[in-house]
Amino acid sequence: MAAPSSRPESNPPLYKQALDFALDVANGRHALSKLIPPALFLVDALLCGLIIWKVPYTEIDWAAYMEQVSQILSGERDYTKVRGGTGPLVYPAAHVYIYTGLYHLTDEGRNILLAQQLFAGLYMVTLAVVMGCYWQAKAPPYLFPLLTLSKRLHSIFVLRCFNDCFAVLFLWLAIFFFQRRNWQAGALLYTLGLGVKMTLLLSLPAVGIVLFLGSGSFVTTLQLVATMGLVQILIGVPFLAHYPTEYLSRAFELSRQFFFKWTVNWRFVGEEIFLSKGFALTLLALHVLVLGIFITTRWIKPARKSLVQLISPVLLAGKPPLTVPEHRAAARDVTPRYIMTTILSANAVGLLFARSLHYQFYAYVAWSTPFLLWRAGLHPVLVYLLWAVHEWAWNVFPSTPASSAVVVGVLGVTVAGVWFGAREEWEPGMKSSSKKEEAAMR
């Protein structure tokens, strides 16, 4: 009987091999995947230089910042009397210190080119930190191009020199150190960012939960919170010592009036509704409600107790909410991905229900959206599509009803998607799928 002939296995078509190779690199399954972040970083550095060279600088707030610093250097300590061309000083004291340094470095603000170069460096440092956070959270490499492609984000940093750039850097540095379980450094950096701009208050509930669950000790958590409060006091001492009420009312003003002509997010509701007190209260109520849903059903899950069970021992018996073994078990579930998902989702919830977003607020959106859309479980094509639509909406000037509806819509999809799609990140018993996914990527 003749032996069956053995045919050599044919190789897959060349296009199939190329596609498999590209998918392996994009999903982190190839050694070349590690080259994607540094390659994109270098390209973006060149792009920043090209923008400074070719695109005219846009004056918005820089001159006002310099005028305000000049008044403070002249001895003014009453925040209600410090004004610039675009209005009063409404930022905490860390903003003043940073722009005082820039005031001296840039010849009292006159050397705009040097200021742009400094902000380009600030952008690159922030981008490096963001990439480090993404890598630590095991985000797939195909997300990284989205970190470098935003026209609006480059404009915020390199062409407009907003103080949001520093606040965003401190926020990402805090996430970076939290992921490495350096709670003291992370808490310090976060509160410094809050000292630049109070927009970082949006992520404060999540930061508090991350510190509580991750530090492994209720006492340590209280110490960290006390340190953050003390830093805020020390930052404001030159102003608190003379005009405390004026400083607090301006630097952390929560009742500020917003102009309909500048809104990026709520133009589609019309000016009458936008300016109404009922609309403001509705947004506040929705913000609190959705935050409560995330806290009770997602963020505190590593504690393996309900919110009532956590609070009751503290209020009724003065005892820590978790025993030492319980706290250690919870801390093990506070992974780099949990930290990033929790803090960025809190930020997204706050931005979704914000009374009014201006164009510079995209600095808090641009680098978080790709990660959150991925955590929502969306297909990469949908991630790129939603990112592109959102980017378009933030580049429409002035905003239109259509563009503002897109801004709110994508934020809504992001928040809802994370709540539904990333639930395993907060469920102690559902992490096996995440670990398998990470193993497949690396």
Curated annotation (Swiss-Prot):
GO terms for biological process: dolichol-linked oligosaccharide biosynthetic process; protein glycosylation. Pathway: Protein modification; protein glycosylation. Its EC number is 2.4.1.258. It is a multi-pass membrane protein. Its main location: endoplasmic reticulum. One of its GO terms (molecular function) is dol-P-Man:Man(5)GlcNAc(2)-PP-Dol alpha-1,3-mannosyltransferase activity. Residues 56-84, 133-155, 220, 294-333, 398-401 are cytoplasmic. The keyword Lipid metabolism does not apply. One of its GO terms (cellular component) is endoplasmic reticulum. It is found in: Endoplasmic reticulum membrane. Residues 1-34, 106-111, 177-198, 242-272, 355-376, 423-442 are lumenal. It is an enzyme of class 2 (transferase). It catalyses: an alpha-D-Man-(1->2)-alpha-D-Man-(1->2)-alpha-D-Man-(1->3)-[alpha-D-Man-(1->6)]-beta-D-Man-(1->4)-beta-D-GlcNAc-(1->4)-alpha-D-GlcNAc-diphospho-di-trans,poly-cis-dolichol + a di-trans,poly-cis-dolichyl beta-D-mannosyl phosphate = an alpha-D-Man-(1->2)-alpha-D-Man-(1->2)-alpha-D-Man-(1->3)-[alpha-D-Man-(1->3)-alpha-D-Man-(1->6)]-beta-D-Man-(1->4)-beta-D-GlcNAc-(1->4)-alpha-D-GlcNAc-diphospho-di-trans,poly-cis-dolichol + a di-trans,poly-cis-dolichyl phosphate + H(+). Keywords: Endoplasmic reticulum, Glycosyltransferase, Membrane, Transferase, Transmembrane, Transmembrane helix. It comes from the Eukaryota. The chain crosses the membrane at residues 35-55, 85-105, 112-132, 156-176, 199-219, 221-241, 273-293, 334-354, 377-397, 402-422. Dol-P-Man:Man(5)GlcNAc(2)-PP-Dol alpha-1,3-mannosyltransferase that operates in the biosynthetic pathway of dolichol-linked oligosaccharides, the glycan precursors employed in protein asparagine (N)-glycosylation. The assembly of dolichol-linked oligosaccharides begins on the cytosolic side of the endoplasmic reticulum membrane and finishes in its lumen. The sequential addition of sugars to dolichol pyrophosphate produces dolichol-linked oligosaccharides containing fourteen sugars, including two GlcNAcs, nine mannoses and three glucoses. Belongs to the glycosyltransferase ALG3 family. This is Dol-P-Man:Man(5)GlcNAc(2)-PP-Dol alpha-1,3-mannosyltransferase. It comes from Neurospora crassa (strain ATCC 24698 / 74-OR23-1A / CBS 708.71 / DSM 1257 / FGSC 987).
